[in-house]
């Protein structure tokens, strides 16, 4: 019986250790979730400011564009857009829409930082892009570089079509 008592006590101790380890892991996971949320907020603020700074310059260089900040359930960012009317002899006027929208998406369960962009030039979608990285591995320079690149590409596409 003594042997069984010892084995029973060891089994109980192993169970308690496993329970303690599981509780510690859950506490660590909650802490890391909090940290990931904090990081997402920090990155979102920095990148949405960069997006606004870049898109705010489009109306200065391409007259007729309007700048709009975006804060919605779809994300945080900005858009630059304009409407043109094309008049052709003997035809109805055609409204032409151009817009560049860039957003940092809300935090998802996958814990990634996601940048999305959609560009339309004269009623034709020119690109729709998404770039994301895990929050633990974010390289802000790659995001700001893509924002700059996509804004420049949109300006070039618009200038070529107008």
Please provide the spans of the model-predicted regions.
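Terminal, compositionally biased segments
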Residues: 1-23, 162
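Intrinsically disordered, low-complexity regulatory segments enriched in Ser/Thr/Pro
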Residues: 1-10, 81-142
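Contiguous, amphipathic alpha-helical segments that mediate oligomerization or scaffolding
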Residues: 14, 18-66
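Conserved N-terminal glycine/acidic-rich loop preference
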Residues: 22-23, 27-31, 78-91
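Residues at beta-strand starts and edge strands
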Residues: 47-49, 65, 74-76, 94-98, ...
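Long, charged, glycine-rich C-terminal linkers/tails
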Residues: 61-81
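Terminal low-complexity "docking" segments
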Residues: 142-146, 151-162
């Amino acid at each position: 019986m003594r042997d069984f008592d010892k084995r029973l006590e060891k089994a109980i101790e192993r169970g308690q250790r496993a329970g303690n380890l599981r509780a510690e892991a859950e506490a660590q996971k909650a802490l890391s979730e909090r940290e990931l949320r904090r990081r997402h907020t920090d990155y979102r603020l920095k990148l949405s400011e960069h997006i606004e700074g870049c898109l705010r310059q489009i109306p200065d260089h391409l007259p007729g564009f309007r700048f709009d900040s975006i804060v919605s359930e779809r994300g945080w960012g900005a858009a630059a857009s304009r409407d043109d009317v094309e008049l052709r002899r003997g035809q109805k006027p055609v409204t032409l829409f151009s817009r560049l929208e860039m957003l940092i998406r809300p935090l998802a369960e996958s814990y990634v930082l996601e940048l999305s962009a959609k560009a339309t030039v004269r009623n034709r979608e020119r690109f729709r892009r998404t770039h994301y990285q895990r929050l633990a591995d974010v390289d802000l320079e790659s995001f700001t570089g893509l924002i700059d690149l996509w804004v420049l590409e949109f300006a070039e596409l618009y200038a070529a079509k107008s």
